[in-house]
Swiss-Prot record:
The active site is at residues 143, 304, 333. Gene3D superfamilies: alpha/beta hydrolase. Keywords: Acyltransferase, Amino-acid biosynthesis, Cytoplasm, Methionine biosynthesis, Transferase. This is Homoserine O-acetyltransferase. Its EC number is 2.3.1.31. The keyword Glycoprotein does not apply. The keyword Acyltransferase applies. Its main location: cytoplasm. It comes from Nostoc punctiforme (strain ATCC 29133 / PCC 73102).
Length: 356
């Protein structure tokens, strides 16, 4: 497995025994799902909690959300059966572009079919059925994970008791789509891209690093960068912020795949909870959000420039049984991965919306 160094030893794997059909009509054979679980499923199978990760995340939620785990915390293994799976199309154990195509015996690469957020959620549902989970107390996630939580409420309303979408919108904005496209173009401009048919020993790392640098700039905020870096120089006489972004770009190339980045950002751009559910106009979008009946804890980050708070306010206004809570932070979009004590407190204080 190509990125096995970044998959924890506790990760488990489930392989589907039947073909998995995507929304596009394309079919994947032998799909594998990488997942982690904590706690025990009760006899009724109704104490499930599903954590959905973001763009470059993995199933190791107890690593990237560690302060939220434990007795008296948002994720309590003594009470709940908690599951986090690596999403379809990723490179941390679940079938994606780096997976060997059983037909060609080579990695899928650029030939991996287009996927959607709904495809990701439907695969999670297959996994949970295999695990015996009958219903979920709540589904939670930030950013791309928040998109999944919204789709869970709409695709499986009888299985999901509550949801907690964090720092996300009901449909990807032109702002987000434009930023994603700029990042993809950076990858395409790398000579090693080769139309996506690069070898895994010579990937387009320069382009992927630049894409990550762009993304990191939107994951933080003006206050965050100004306070942390200002106009400081590092020992090599670069601006400290330039060194930081270059470091973050290099780090991603060591643990992530460019085709995977392309596939997942396209899936995010396609995010629209009203797509194919009703005619594509504003009133129908509003009616789809209005059809979500589950108690919903919407978390907005006041300094988020990627998914600005107006988008979470829209969710809270249109979902009938929703509560808007504010994660106040200078860290921008990534505050849900940085200010975790504050996030845990928000979840704990809103137990009527995140059902325990």
């Amino acid at each position: 497995m190509i990125y096995s160094d970044f998959i924890s030893p506790q990760t488990q794997f489930y392989q589907l025994t039947v073909p998995f059909q995507l929304e596009s009509g394309k079919v994947l054979i032998g799909v594998q799902v990488a997942y982690r679980s904590w706690g025990e499923l009760n006899a009724q199978g109704d104490n499930g909690v599903l954590i959905c990760h973001a763009l470059t995340g993995s199933a190791d939620a107890d690593d990237w959300w560690e302060p939220l785990f434990g007795s008296g915390k948002a994720f309590n293994p003594d009470r709940d059966f908690i599951v986090c799976s690596n999403i379809l199309g990723s490179c941390y154990g679940t079938t994606g572009p780096t997976t060997i195509n059983p037909t060609t015996r080579k990695p899928y690469g650029v030939s991996f079919p287009k996927i959607t957020i709904r495809d990701m959620v439907r695969l999670q549902a297959v996994l949970l059925e295999y695990l015996g989970v009958q219903s979920l107390r709540f589904v939670i996630g930030g950013s791309l994970g928040g998109m999944q939580s919204l789709e869970w409420a709409l695709l499986y309303p009888d299985k999901v008791k509550s949801i907690a979408p964090i720092a996300v919108s009901g449909r990807h904005s032109a702002w987000c789509i434009g930023l994603s496209e700029a990042q993809r173009q950076a990858i395409y401009a790398d000579p090693n891209w080769q139309g996506g048919n690069y070898t895994l020993d010579a990937p387009p790392n320069q382009g992927l690093a630049v894409a990550r640098m762009m993304a990191m700039s939107t994951y933080r905020s003006w206050d965050s960068f100004t306070t942390r870096f200002g106009r400081q120089y590092d020992p090599s006489e670069k601006f400290a912020i330039a060194s930081y972004l270059q470091h973050q770009g290099q780090k991603l190339t060591e643990r992530f795949d460019a085709n995977t980045y392309i596939i997942l950002t396209h899936a995010m751009d396609g995010h629209d909870i009203a797509r194919d559910r009703t005619a594509p106009n504003l009133s129908d979008y509003e009616s789809v959000l209005g059809s979500i009946q589950q108690p919903t804890l919407v978390v907005a980050i006041d300094s988020d420039i990627l998914y600005p708070p107006v988008e979470q306010q829209e969710l809270a206004n249109l979902i009938p049984n929703a509560q808007l809570s504010w994660l106040k932070s200078t860290h921008g979009h990534d505050a849900f991965l940085i200010d975790m004590a504050a996030l845990n407190e928000i979840i704990q204080q809103n137990h009527e919306f995140v059902l325990f």
